[in-house]
Regions:
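Active-site metal-binding loops of divalent metal-dependent hydrolases
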Residues: 12-13, 103, 133-135
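Loop/turn elements at helix/coil->beta-strand transitions in domains of secreted/extracellular proteins
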Residues: 3-7, 33-38, 92-97, 124-129, ...
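Stable alpha-helical elements in mature extracytoplasmic
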Residues: 9, 19-26, 54, 110-117, ...
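His/acidic metal-ligating clusters that form di-metal
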Residues: 111-132
Length: 223
């Protein structure tokens, strides 16, 4: 499933040593399957010990080049519990930066964190930003309006991405939380959607051992 894509952005990597080991093992498995893959893992986020985690990127080195060092956002780290992880990649002669993010849970009001994202395009005017991850907030929320007014657009609309513990009315997806946002003047969408990996398992319980969210995907070209 993963080897069909060139970048994999991962949230909720365990902050302890085991999390980094798991990402390394996944990268090793991809290398066995073909192509040459590498990975980068963030430092621990500056959140309380019960909420801290790491982010990770895995990328296909035959297609992409990582530019410089990846970094955790510092300016708003006291405002955002798990500050986003930035990494710049180059495809041929064009660059883009993926902003990997995991928001606080819905009951904690993730919009109080997401509202700071409107400052990132001005803070990094030379970067072609793609915001990606688990926002715990639907794209229809007004907190995304400032980004939309700047020309950013979500790759998914009305697409639920979290897995229920059991089917309800024949449906297993619960909430519209995961998405990506890109600037339409700099990026063209070729394809976007979800990867319904849970259909490969005998039950939702089995699938949720892997993840309680389904992966989302974005195929694009750079202007």
């Amino acid at each position: 499933m993963l080897r069909d894509y060139d970048i994999i952005a991962i949230q909720e990597v365990v902050a302890g040593y085991g999390g980094a080991q798991a990402v390394a093992r996944l990268t090793d498995e991809l290398n066995i399957k073909g192509n040459k893959w590498d990975y980068v893992i963030s430092d621990k986020t500056r959140s309380n010990p019960y909420k801290t985690e790491r982010y990770a990127f895995i990328w296909n080195m035959n297609k992409l080049k990582k530019i410089g060092k990846a970094w955790l956002e510092k300016k708003y780290q006291l405002k955002i519990e798990r500050e986003p992880f930035f990494c710049t990649f180059q495809y041929k002669n064009k660059q883009f930066t993926v902003v990997n993010f995991h928001a606080i849970t819905k009951d904690k009001q993730p919009e109080t964190e997401i509202k700071y994202f409107k400052f990132f395009p001005e803070e990094y005017p030379n970067l072609n930003l793609i915001f990606a991850g688990d926002f715990n907030c639907p794209q229809s929320h007004t907190v995304f309006n400032p980004l939309k007014k700047m020309g950013y657009q979500s790759i998914l609309v009305n697409q639920k991405t979290s897995l229920r513990q059991a089917f309800k009315n024949g449906k297993c997806l619960a909430s519209e939380f995961d998405n990506m946002y890109y600037k339409t003047s700099k990026i063209n969408t070729i394809n976007s959607g979800i990867i319904p990996f849970h259909k490969n398992f005998n039950s939702l319980k089995e699938a949720r051992i892997i993840s309680d969210h389904i992966p989302i995907c974005f195929e694009f070209s750079l202007n």
